[in-house]
Every structure is written in C-alpha cells, then in structure tokens.
Amino acid sequence: MIVTRSWLNEWIDISTISTDKLVKTLNSIGLEVDSISSYEVPQKIVFGRVLECKKHPDADKLNICQVDIGVSTRQIVCGASNVRAGLDVVVATIGAVMPDGTIIKPVTLRGIESEGMICSAKEIGLADINSGIIEIDSSIGKYKIGEEVSQNHLFSDDIIEVELTANRGDCLSIRGVARDLSAAFDKPLRERKIQEDEDKRVGIGRILSLSHENNLGVNIRYKAVDFKNLTLPFIVRLRLSQLDDKKESDVESLMLYATHSSGVILRAYDYALFCAKDETMAKISLCRDKNGFASVMTKDKKVSIVGVMQEELFKVAHSNGVVLIEATYIPPDVISKKMQENKIPAGISYYRASRGSEPDLNQGLDYCISVIEDNSESSVYGGTIEIDEPHEDKIISLNKKEIDEIVGANIDKAKITKILKNLGFDTTKSLADNFVIIVPKFRHDIVNKQDIVEEIVRLVGIDNIPSKPFTFTETNSFSSDYYDYKKRVTYRHKAAFSGFFESVHFVFDEKKVLQEYGFEILDESKELLNPIVNTLDTLRSTLLCGLLRATSNNINNGYSSVKLFEVGSVFNSQREESLKMALIFSGDREAESLANTGKPAKVDFALFVQKVSNVIGEFELREYKTKHTLSHPYQCAEIFIKEVSVGEIFRLHPNVEQKYDLDVTYMCELNFNKLPNDLKTAKQSSKYQASFRDLSIVMPQEMAYEKIKNVIDASSTKELVRFYVVDKYSDKSLGENMSLSIRFVLQSFDKTLEEEEITNAMNTILEALKNQLGVGIR
C-alpha cells in the first residue's frame, strides 16, 4: 500500500509531525513500513506563466515563449507539444542544477536566445505523468508566479510503502491508513461531504432505473454525472504515476484515484450502453448469475460482477457525456468463498473486495464527485439510486479484568474507551467495568475479545507495557506421541547398528500380488477410486512384498548380500491402520574377505534369528504355520516376547526365491505396537561367585524345547539364575531320541553356594523333568 505525506494530509493533519515520527508510529501500530523514499525539486526551479507563445521561424517543432517568472519575463525556446499562452508551468532558471546534473545556462537555439527551460515532470525528478511539460493548476493549492517550486508540498514529498497483512483490508486506502493514524495521534479524521442543492439538480431517477433480486448480500449505489471537458488535474496525474497505475481514459483513472484514496470500490459505466434504442432511460438489473455471484446486467448482457470484474465493453473511454458511477461493497468472506468455489478470472477490484473494502459508500462517491466538480464543467445529477442491505453488527463483550489479564498490565479504563472510540468502535452500551463493543463495519478482522485487546495493545504500544516474568510449574512434557516416536527411532537405530539398511515404500501395493500370496486385501467398498498406477492399486496389508521387491532389485544390481528393514503403516480389510516392522536377509552371510577365502557361507536360520534378536531383544520361537504362502513350509516360527506373540520369522519359499532371482532368503514381520518399549531398570546383582553346571538330557526328537523350558522354570529353584542350550547331539544309538546339553547358572545373594546345595538344586530339576516329561540324563 503506497501513501504519501501530502495525500495523508488530505484526511488527517500531519503538518507538524516529522516523517521519522510518522514512520515509527506506523510501525508501532502494526502497519509495517516496507520502504520510504523522498523527493524534492532542486533550487532555482520556479512557477512561471507563459505570456506569449509563437512558432520558431527556423524549426517546426520549437516555440518561442515569453515566460513570466515573477521578477522578470524570460524568453525560452520550448519544444513541448502542449506549451501555449496562458499556461502556468515549471521553469528551471539560469543556474539551476537538474537532478541529472545538468546546469541550466543561456543558450541559442537556431539563432534564438533561450534563458531557461520549461520542465516536464521527469526532468525535475518526478514520476513521468505525460509526454509534455507540466501543466500547473489549482489542484496543487496556493502558489505564486516566481515562487520556488520546492516550497509546495507536492513537489517536496515522502512516498511511504506500507506492508499490510491480508486481514487489514481496512487500510488498503489513504483514508484507511489515516484513520489508524488519527487514533494513534489522537487527531480528528477529516471528512469530505458534498452539500447538494437538490432543488437545482435533475434527479437521477429521471435517467436511471434499478431492479434487483432480494437477499443479494451486497450494497450498491449509483450517481450520474454529465461530463463536460474533464481534464485530470496535475495532483491526480502525479499521484497515479507514483502508484505506477494509470488507465487509458481519464474517467477510469479518476475511479482508480478515488478508490485508492477513499477505499470504496468505484466503477464507471457508459450510460448510453444501458439505454435501449430511442430511449433515454437506462435500465440496470442486479441478480445472481449461474455461479451465484451478484452481477450487474442490462439488456440480458452481463456488465460486471460485484467485487470481481467489469466487462471491457462497458468501461468509459471518453471524457464527455453521461457516465454512471457505481460504488459497491460486499463482505470479504462472502466473495472469497465464492471465488474458491468458482475459479473465474478476477479484475483489480477483487484484491480489495476479498480483503475488505470500505463499506461507507458515500465516502467514495463524495470524494470522486468533489474532484470532478473542481476540475471540469460537469454537472452531477441529484440523489442516488441504491440497494442498501443491512449487515448484522458484530458485538463483543468483555470486562476490564479480562483485558488486564490478557495484556498483563493494568490499563486505565478511560484510556481503553478513548482508544476504542478513536478506532471507530462503539462502546456506548458499556456499563461500569463491562465493555459491550460494537465492531465497525470496516473492521472485518475483529471477531473475538482477543482481537479487541490486540487493538488496545497496538495503540498503547507494546514497549509501553511493563515486562513481567512468566511464572509456571514445570510438568512432564513427554506425551504418548513422544514415546511412540522415540520407540520408532530406537528400533530403527538398532536395526541399522545390526547391519540392516532402511527401505521406505509407499503405503500402496499391487492387489494382484497380495492375493497371489494369500495376504489380506481391502474390502471392495474400501478400495482406492483413483490409483496412482496399476502396480500401486491398493493399500498394503504387509511390508513383506515391498521388501521382497527391493531386495530383488539390489541383487539384480550386483549385491550378493542384502539386509533391509522397514517400519511403516499397513491396513486391514476395513482400512484400519496399524504399524509393523519387517526385516529381510538374503544371500551371503558376510562380505568376501581373507577370513572366508573369498567364499562366504550363505545366511542360515540361526544367524537371522540372532540378527533379529539384536534388534528386538530376547524372544522365544514356537511352532507356527503362516497364513500366507511366502514362507517355507518347514522353516517358520512364531515370535513370542514375555508370552506375547509379536510376529513371525521364516525362510522364503524356494519357489518365491527362484521367481525373484534370490539366493537363500529369510524374512521377519513384527507387530510394532507389541514390541517392548519399557524403560530399562537396574537389578541387584550378587557379589558372590556363580556356579555353572551342564546337564545332557535324552529327549524325543519331536519334543519341543518349550516343554523342557517350562518345566525348569516351574521347578522353584531359587538359586537358578538362568539356563540356556549349548549343544545337541543325535546318532543311531539314540534312535528317535536326541541329546540336549543345557548349561545352568546358579548363584545366591547371601553366600557362595556349596557343592551340596548345587547338587540338590540340579537333582530337583532332574526329578521334575523325569516326573513330568519322562526324560533323564544321558
């Protein structure tokens, strides 16, 4: 948003306020100044008046002018096409140093002496406003011939660019910024009202009729002007050039100027286009179009969409004749929602309408009409034709205590009331310390009591609020989400430390492959409607297929040993999500080296089990048949941790290994949510020596070790610390039996165990095995 000091001064008196203070104030009230630039016309450049103008005898494009510069009359040769007698101009006198460094000196042009230069805007350091010299008019205020141009506020000004947030549409105008400054400086906002003498003017109702649908949710107002010899004044041309935005016609430029100044969205229409043939009554209808937008129509043609765009055909391209001036307002939330639903092309007015334009339509119309009447012989039709739909007031209630608690400081009630009043809030219904606040229509961003307090803090100034230490009691900041995240990171790190590389896949898989191997698939009603590709046409119910493909790709790329893992989401037939972890080990058990003479052995079940144990800790394996067909029928087991089933481990079926060009391959899939995540707790250890004893027992080959383990665990031998298998043996002499060697570790917390105590403990275990399972020592 671009503003200038002189333009702001039209709406609020800042003549005694320095630019530095103005900028600091804008920043302090939340209107952040993005940049500031100043310009001042050099010395010895004065106002002049062309007394006489005649053609140069030896040059068609040059004119010889007699120019009054106050102290004397100077002869100046000028080549501008718009120079003429009676014109007030800007003259660079002898000795003036121009912005580009040129020094004005007496010269002779085609035999004619010239003492000075009649200047264009660009030549004195202003923005380029036209192709000729500056034409001075009354719009710049009072001036005297011969007076230094730099003494006029328009020729010595500051241009300030303010960076606005999207919710501050109320400051997308000079008047809007001035309104905030009036509250900050406690100065009144200047209003521009037109005193119409209705009896002397032709009523607009004689030339315009308006019909409309009900409940359109827009406010719209029309004025009619019969333009005669409209010429944009210098001040308008200069300011539009500073905005770097000028329209092709003077009328369109004037609408842009008045909109930027007042904040009201203004449009101009060619009156003749609204009249039927041989009729003088223009007819406008306002209705919703097929997309639900409030649209201006005439003769079944769309003229414009309120707050969005205007058809080029109905724009004004001339400066004479009757023109309809339209002022509109539509709530920003309404127009923004409509535009999100219907992606239609938008004009420049949408930017302002979607952020919140000025709802006081008279402000824009009065400002525009005053510029027209001051700078042309145009006549304005009396009255307006309008649709004025009421918009519900936003009322916010809060009390003094709430304000103080949010701010963290005690602010005087009278000061609060004054700030809110200066900002346009109505507090007349407030009682005692209870504020009942009616939000002004132009403040679309105010929706709750926190917004009200923010307005108070803006005007008080954050630097003027004393700092207070924040007192609080530290609580446990770790949530279940953190522990879930920590668990996932921990297991991923353990897998990486064990030599596995992480593999990451989409949560999609190929339905045909899942069905082929007997995995669960989505119910038909839950399937994907628009798959990315045919090979990713469903949600995965297992991580195994993805790891299998990744391993095959690595083997095909020349790797002889592949170890991968993945932690990710899977879905059951009802699209219910769960988390799983899977690991795969394929090919050589280790890299080629001198130790294995370059011929490493293949991975086996025991090695893979040990690798998985390094990741998830100790576990038991129990006999198990998988529900899918990826598994080898005789090399698969169920994994238990503390009597809880957490997953399965198996060798890949030889047919599947062959299909994917894999060597010996083992896989494991775990229910991640069932994996332990307990904090490690310290256990007391005995200071006395431990004793080791080995027992070799004869047992049937088909007997599960689990039975042996359960009997030993239940033997109630308190000295037994742990036990584990160290060897197994079978030969013909044992027949259908085998020998299993188990090592026992015995230890007491009270003393060093004596031989008799150790023997009694081992006998207790042997007796339990014999009585319950019928097995004994070899």
From Swiss-Prot:
Its EC number is 6.1.1.20. Belongs to the phenylalanyl-tRNA synthetase beta subunit family. Type 1 subfamily. It holds the Pfam family tRNA_synthFbeta. GO terms for molecular function: ATP binding; magnesium ion binding; phenylalanine-tRNA ligase activity; tRNA binding. Binds 2 magnesium ions per tetramer. Keywords: Aminoacyl-tRNA synthetase, ATP-binding, Cytoplasm, Ligase, Magnesium, Metal-binding, Nucleotide-binding, Protein biosynthesis, RNA-binding, tRNA-binding. This is Phenylalanine--tRNA ligase beta subunit. Gene3D superfamilies: 3.30.56.10, Bira Bifunctional Protein, Domain 2, Ferrodoxin-fold anticodon-binding domain, Nucleic acid-binding proteins. One of its GO terms (cellular component) is phenylalanine-tRNA ligase complex. Mg(2+) binds at residues 445, 451, 454-455. The gene is pheT. It catalyses: tRNA(Phe) + L-phenylalanine + ATP = L-phenylalanyl-tRNA(Phe) + AMP + diphosphate + H(+). Tetramer of two alpha and two beta subunits. It is an enzyme of class 6 (ligase). The keyword Translocase does not apply. SUPFAM superfamilies: Anticodon-binding domain of PheRS (SSF54991), Class II aaRS and biotin synthetases (SSF55681), Nucleic acid-binding proteins (SSF50249), PheT/TilS domain (SSF56037), Putative DNA-binding domain (SSF46955). Residues 686-778 form the FDX-ACB domain. Residues 391-467 form the B5 domain. Its cofactor is Mg(2+). One of its GO terms (biological process) is phenylalanyl-tRNA aminoacylation.
